[in-house]
């Protein structure tokens, strides 16, 4: 159903733009970067690149066909601020990104353990989730060097389910 795809994928990805923009404005860098892990067909990475042209977005996916699709989208949409890498996130050299995002990628614990080394000092991991993932938060705190900094409710037009962003930072940072 095209209408449902619009809501579940495009509107859902658009709901990330304002919180991400706000967070990047607070970071002391002139060249903000985002790594979108498990990007699939480029959501939310392509949406972020369109809406935040001053930010470079790297979409990472383990499936080559999906990374190729993101590259094709970047060309068709003339987006100079996006790139795609076909790789498992844990195999890449540290990317030193301002934010590392995920949408439907993994548990918070797995996301932090696999992707945390790609966040520069002072940056954040940001996971899009449905309802507040209480059990995942417990595992995150118990088994990783990361802590939830905030859980931000998201409003997605036309979507009846709950959505939230889990903002994470390294333990011991403020």
Question: What residue ranges belong to the model's regions?
Answer:
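Conserved class I S-adenosyl-L-methionine
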Residues: 28-40
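S-adenosylmethionine
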Residues: 54-174
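Conserved alpha-helix/loop element of class I SAM-dependent methyltransferases that forms part
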Residues: 5-30
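Short linear capping/connector segments at secondary-structure termini
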Residues: 1-3
């Amino acid at each position: 159903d095209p209408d449902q795809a619009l809501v579940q994928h495009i509107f859902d990805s658009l709901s990330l733009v304002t919180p991400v923009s706000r967070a990047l404005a607070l970071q002391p860098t002139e060249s903000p970067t985002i790594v979108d892990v498990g990007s699939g067909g480029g959501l939310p990475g392509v949406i972020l690149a369109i809406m935040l042209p001053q930010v470079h977005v790297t979409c990472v996916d383990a499936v080559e066909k999906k990374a190729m699709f993101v590259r094709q989208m970047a060309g068709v949409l003339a987006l100079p601020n996006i790139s795609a890498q076909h790789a498992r996130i844990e195999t890449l050299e540290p990317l030193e990104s301002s934010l590392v995002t995920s949408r439907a990628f993994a548990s918070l614990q797995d996301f932090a353990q696999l992707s945390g080394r790609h966040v520069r000092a002072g940056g954040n991991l940001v996971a899009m989730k449905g309802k507040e993932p209480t059990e995942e938060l417990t595992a995150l705190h118990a088994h990783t060097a990361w802590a939830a900094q905030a859980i931000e409710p998201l409003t997605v037009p036309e979507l009846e389910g709950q959505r939230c962003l889990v903002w994470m930072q390294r333990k011991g940072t403020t």
